Amino acid sequence: MSSDKLHKVVHEAHDVEARHAPEHFYNSQPGKSYCTDEEHYREMYTQSIEDPAGFFGPLAKEYLDWDRPFTQVQSGSLEHGDIAWFLNGELNASYNCVDRHAFANPDKPALIYEADDESENKVITFGELLRQVSEVAGVLQSWGVKKGDTVAVYLPMIPAAVVAMLAVARLGAIHSVIFAGFSAGSLKERVVDAGCKVVITCDEGKRGGKTVHTKKIVDEGLAGVDSVSKILVFQRTGTQGIPMKPARDFWWHEECVKQRGYLPPVPVNSEDPLFLLYTSGSTGSPKGVVHSTAGYLLGSALTTRFVFDIHPEDVLFTAGDVGWITGHTYALYGPLTLGTATIIFESTPAYPDYGRYWRIIERHRATHFYVAPTALRLIKRVGEEEIAKYDTSSLRVLGSVGEPISPDLWEWYHEKVGKNNCVICDTMWQTESGSHLIAPLAGAVPTKPGSATVPFFGINACIIDPVSGEELKGNDVEGVLAVKSPWPSMARSVWNNHARYFETYLKPYPGYYFTGDGAGRDHDGYYWIRGRVDDVVNVSGHRLSTAEIEAALAEHEGVSEAAVVGITDELTGQAVIAFVSLKDGYLSENAVEGDSTHISPDNLRRELILQVRGEIGPFAAPKTVVVVNDLPKTRSGKIMRRVLRKVASKEADQLGDLSTLANADVVPSIISAVENQFFSQQKK
């Protein structure tokens, strides 16, 4: 670290230059930008903070259709946890996403389905979507589903999942989407907690060329669950012999043909729940985050429009599943509220080859691509050469979601995928926020590699000192990220447990919403997200961002991915333990001196520790580096550092809730690696 940066708190901000939107972005726009420049953003943002009623009230009337107008824009406070928006108004989410667009332009594409098998791709228009949603809503209504009831949706990323969600919302009921990769036990836990009367699923799923026995998992999970009276089964594969329990299980296609092609939507109150979405905590059972109808819809629409500069003619490719908040907000509710076509992607970036993403973009002339850094790292590692084979010139905006994107991956994304012609939108938000908290407005706000940039409208972001609890004013400060006033799309509660909601988000810093993330605000007022606060390590009084150490490790030519955790240390308070997965074939027990493509385990650890010392300083050097085959990741692509911390702290018997792990099978090998590479060395 150079001496002129030592006194800077957010020192990495001085390593990058602000980037303005390239000419291609403006030349390829189908219309004028919704936010024209940085000054326009500042004006709108200031109004949204100083006069939220005057800002969001007119926008709610402009972007949403109401059955009954609201009489008050906002009430309640973070201190009391009684937030409400657009009071006394009535509307329906399904109508706002489907009907009004179908009436205006029934032949306009709504859902572009990219199936696991590309020969099964199809396009569903708004007119067709309205008919399908009405039919499924009719089935549910005939089963007694009504306003306020909860319905579980356990489907893969196929159009039927979108149809099911909108059908539930059409009746004023509450959908609880459960990711179709969850186990039977995890499914049961969520269905029972939500009190679901009906489950919507399918016979089987297809992903990466493999068959997923979806209905079988549902049957196992619901064994003995008497509260579920009906199961609607979509025929995805048509496999014969799928067990169907009489009087409980019914085929989607057989029931839908009995229904009318149009079912009027049921108006609900602005604050009535639209959906539950379960998110896993570090301890205890998963919590069902509750999102309201009007506030969530408006937040999803506004962020989709202004952050991504989405126009009605655009095509949005969000490579996320509706089992997670990214799929809810930016594959469904955001684009459909705006009447924009959205790509529903069932498969993986590697099936049938690593050209899949780029074929999708070329085939459908996608203008926006929104993906997690995990997928980008995978492609960078093994499939980069596929990008150049396809015409991706339709792209205008590239988004990143799920975790902070490192500056080097940001640059790769910009150059290799965007051909230096696209705006990069690094977005920071979470299940509980409903929509973007920190993100650039494409074309209006200059970007910085590694920074999520600036707060969205209504997000009164601040940095709090985690020790004193005081807000840190000014720029070049670092602490925990919080928000000090309510915004429309924020979660309202945890299902059946408002006390847990209050304890988790509103009590840690009274008067503020606590995001749980560490962050820095640089000299320009841009935000740099550090990751979860429990991913900050304090070594000998030095507060170290694990993201910074991980970035230093990732610069090594042999490292594919890195994760860093802190464990208790008698001498330094905490010690840094690094976990790395390597590029294929890089490590060799028999490597010889001078071999530039292979290295022995001991030499690799030595190099990595020296790399961190050189990049950050001796105080940041890991106590040890553990080489693993893969890192534990949630199904949304985030590394579950809690697992690594527990294992490294000799608490492998206290791992907590692992239901969101996509690769739980790697945990035993990680435990073994820590034992062999760390604990055994301590004994010597």
UniProtKB/Swiss-Prot annotation:
EC number: 6.2.1.1
Gene Ontology cellular component terms for the protein in this record: cytosol
Any single Pfam family the record assigns to this protein: AMP-binding_C
Residues annotated for CoA binding in this entry: 207-210, 326, 540, 613
Entry's Gene Ontology BP terms: acetyl-CoA biosynthetic process from acetate
Alphabetized CDD domains for the sequence: ACS
One GO MF term attached to the UniProt entry: AMP binding
PROSITE patterns referenced in this protein's UniProt entry, alphabetically: AMP_BINDING
Catalytic reactions of this protein: acetate + ATP + CoA = acetyl-CoA + AMP + diphosphate
Keyword entries, A-Z: ATP-binding, Ligase, Nucleotide-binding
Top enzyme category: ligase
The keyword ATP-binding is annotated on this UniProt entry: yes
Keyword set includes Mitochondrion: no
InterPro entries recorded: Ac_CoA_lig, ACAS_N, AMP-bd_C, AMP-bd_C_sf, AMP-binding_CS, AMP-dep_synth/lig_dom, ANL_N_sf
Binding-site positions, ATP: 402-404, 426-431, 517, 532, 543
PANTHER family (alphabetical): ACETYL-COENZYME A SYNTHETASE (PTHR24095), ACETYL-COENZYME A SYNTHETASE 2 (PTHR24095:SF245)
Annotated family: Belongs to the ATP-dependent AMP-binding enzyme family.
UniProt-listed NCBIfam families: Ac_CoA_lig_AcsA (TIGR02188), PRK00174.1 (NF001208)
Protein name: Acetyl-coenzyme A synthetase 2
